[in-house]
Swiss-Prot record:
Belongs to the universal ribosomal protein uS4 family. One of its GO terms (cellular component) is small ribosomal subunit. It comes from the Bacteria. This is Small ribosomal subunit protein uS4. InterPro entries: Ribosomal_uS4 (IPR022801), Ribosomal_uS4_bac-type (IPR005709), Ribosomal_uS4_CS (IPR018079), Ribosomal_uS4_N (IPR001912), S4_RNA-bd (IPR002942), S4_RNA-bd_sf (IPR036986). GO terms for molecular function: rRNA binding; structural constituent of ribosome. Residues 31-54 are annotated as: Disordered. Residues 42-53 have a biased composition (Polar residues). GO terms for biological process: ribosomal small subunit biogenesis; translation. It comes from Cupriavidus metallidurans (strain ATCC 43123 / DSM 2839 / NBRC 102507 / CH34) (Ralstonia metallidurans).
Length: 207
C-alpha cells in the first residue's frame, strides 16, 4: 500500500481524534471538526461497528500516527509478540523507538512526517554519524542531533522552540542550544501520549 499524501486533517477526522499529523502551531480543533467524518455533510451510519471493525480501525489509526505501512506494521507486531512482557506495550515501544519518531519527540520536527523528511535528507546524526533510515531503532544512550549545516533551517528552530514550550517526554533529554538529545530509555506505557487502545490490535492479530 502506498503512503497517504492527501489532507492530513481528513485522517484525524476519520478517526475522531487528533493523530498529531499536523504542526501544533494551531490546535487541530480550530482547523477541522473532529466530531464529524470526512465528506460534504459527514458520513453517518446507523449500523453498529463490529468488534473486528473496531480492531481494524485501531490498527489503521496507529499506522497513521506513526506513518508505518502494513508490511512494516506486521513485522513490528511479530517482534513485539516475540519479546517478553505485554505485546501491546512492546509494540508501542518499538514504534516510539523509530528514529523518525525520536527526532519528532525531541522537537527537531514539528510532525513525524517532517522528522522523517529530515532523516531522509541526512539532516540527522546518531552518535555523531549520519543515519538516513527513518525506521532505524534507537537504543538507550544513543545521542541524536541535528547536522551542523542543518541547524540554520528555520523550520527546525521553530519546531524546537515550540517543543521547549510544550515540554519534552521524560524518556529523552534534550539540549536545545546544541540541537542534541539523548534517548534515555524506552518509554513506559504511561509516558506514551495519544488516544491508543493497543489491546484491540493484539486481539486483531490473535484472531
Amino acid at each position: 500500500m502506498a503512503r497517504y499524501i492527501g489532507p492530513k486533517a481528513k485522517l484525524s477526522r476519520r478517526e475522531g481524534t487528533d493523530l498529531f499529523l499536523k504542526s501544533a502551531r494551531r490546535s487541530l480543533a480550530d482547523k477541522c471538526k473532529l466530531d464529524s467524518k470526512p465528506g460534504q455533510h459527514g458520513r453517518t451510519s446507523g449500523a453498529r461497528t463490529s468488534d473486528y471493525g473496531n480492531q481494524l480501525r485501531e490498527k489503521q489509526k496507529v499506522k497513521r500516527i506513526y506513518g508505518v505501512l502494513e508490511r512494516q506494521f506486521r513485522r513490528y507486531f511479530a517482534e513485539a509478540d516475540r519479546r517478553k512482557g505485554n505485546t501491546g506495550e512492546n509494540l508501542l515501544q518499538l514504534l516510539e523507538s523509530r528514529l523518525d519518531n525520536v527526532v519528532y519527540r525531541m522537537g527537531f520536527g514539528s510532525t513525524r512526517a517532517e522528522a522523517r523528511q529530515l532523516v531522509s535528507h541526512k539532516a540527522i546524526l546518531v552518535n555523531g554519524e549520519t543515519l538516513n533510515v527513518p525506521s532505524a531503532q534507537i537504543k538507550s544512550g544513543d545521542i541524536v542531533s541535528v547536522r551542523e549545516q542543518s541547524k540554520k533551517q528555520v523550520r527546525i528552530a521553530e519546531a524546537l522552540s515550540l517543543a521547549e514550550q510544550s515540554g519534552f517526554p521524560t524518556w529523552v533529554a534534550v539540549d536545545a542550544k546544541k540541537f542534541e538529545g539523548t534517548y534515555k530509555q524506552a518509554p513506559d506505557r504511561a509516558d506514551i501520549s495519544g488516544d491508543i487502545n493497543e489491546s484491540l490490535i493484539v486481539e486483531l492479530y490473535s484472531r
